[in-house]
Amino acid sequence: MVGQSDPSTSEKPSGICFSYAQIRGSVPVFWEQAAGLIPGQQKITVTRSPEGTQPAFDKHFGELEQNYGSVHVVNLLSETKPGEAELTNLYRYGVRHSALNHTEGQNSQDHQLLRETEFDFHAETKGPNGYEAASMIRRLIENSADGFAYYLSEEIDDSAEDPQEKSARRTVVVLQQEGVFRTNCLDCLDRTNLIQTIISQMAMESFLAHRGERAASDFWMRHSSLWADNGDALSRIYAGTGALKSSFTRHGKMSIAGAIADARKSATRLYINNFADKGRQNTIDVLLGRMMGQTPVHLFDPMNDYVTAELAKRSSEFSSSESINM
């Protein structure tokens, strides 16, 4: 999420840039899910032991730590559904045995580079408050949110020595984001998008509070609409329909029309999952040459070939060669 001041709002734009990064991704262990005719009852199979998973788990989070700093996992899986509960147990094992939690001489939780918060989304939101209860996640992650901060930069004028010369503008980094939230549910679509919307709102509220400002309700409506559009776009790519719960994300409340729309999307997903995805997967496997006994496939990319050939023709303009003895 990146926000920048609007030059049209003043004669001289302030040049303030706000940015906040989040990550979403499925549980980083080795597992697969079979199609099923009953929604939510698709069988989950773990294909590698916790010990066998740990090296890949550590590599994944090591790369995240290098790129973003501290990582706070927000796991939204169910505690009661057997498959999701098993994934949660494996996730918990990986976090507990991660090298990021065993920094030498720093056993305090304040120095952990990898933390985990488990928030059973369905259990927390099944009460009378519905999806509004999802906002309870705030108190569980607010310490990390405050510690991670956000990225903020500002353009300032460099005074020119000659009064007749135009002063140049340069960007000064005021604040750096020091960590990142990695949010997941099972497919990282509906539940994940709603919680990421809340985390994004927390970051924006912190930014505005530090500036002594408050956003109007219209601003938050636009913010919610952006996140609802984001959830719908990702869901169409992955599941073939818009995201569930997008009505709540967009309007802040769940209407009857929104509930009916979610039911329709669930039925469409069920059909696609059982009758369309298998054919698409077979097509992808054929294209990549992964079918049993298939002749290897060589993909033809004329644009890449053209660019490579043109670069080779003009290589003397940007490279040189020299013979050496070793």
Model-derived features: positions:
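Phosphoinositide system proteins, centered on phosphoinositide phosphatases
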Residues: 1-174, 203-326
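A phosphate-binding catalytic loop at a beta-strand-loop-alpha-helix junction
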Residues: 179-198
